[in-house]
């Protein structure tokens, strides 16, 4: 896989309400039905924090800004976000990145 400077990386930090991390993770899995159909989405990986079961991280990698925008403005995205609300313990934080180099890219 060739890496271009137009590639967009994103790390999302999702704090779950106390004791709701596993429920948030389960609810989040609904995204994969849609993400698996997105041609410009290279990686979309859900993680649980190794030291805090109520903190989830999502690593996302897109072909370009257009693919990232298409993902975040997709028809399914807003209702999906609302479906996570009962399990959230705070606002998600998003960190946009420009990948430089790495194994697997």
Residue ranges and their predicted role:
Residues 1-8, 46-54, 82-105:
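Glycine-rich beta-strand-turn "strand-cap" elements at beta-sheet edges
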Residues 8, 18, 39:
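Short glycine-rich loop/turn motifs that provide flexible caps or phosphate-binding loops at active sites
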Residues 8-15, 45-72:
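Short, well-ordered beta-strand segments in beta-rich or mixed alpha/beta enzyme
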Residues 15-24:
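Short, surface-exposed ligand-recognition loops at beta-strand->loop->(often short) alpha-helix junctions
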Residues 30-42, 61-95:
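An amphipathic, aromatic/His-enriched active-site/gating alpha helix that lines ligand/cofactor pockets
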């Amino acid at each position: 896989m060739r890496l271009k400077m137009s590639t967009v990386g994103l790390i999302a930090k999702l704090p779950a309400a106390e004791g709701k991390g596993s429920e948030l993770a389960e609810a989040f899995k609904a995204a994969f039905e849609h993400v698996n159909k997105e041609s410009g989405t290279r990686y979309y990986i859900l993680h649980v924090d190794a030291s805090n079961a109520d903190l989830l991280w999502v690593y996302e990698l897109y072909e370009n800004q257009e693919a990232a925008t298409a993902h975040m403005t997709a028809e399914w995205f807003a209702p999906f976000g609302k479906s996570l609300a009962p399990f959230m313990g705070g606002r998600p934080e998003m960190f946009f990145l420009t990948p430089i180099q790495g194994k697997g890219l």
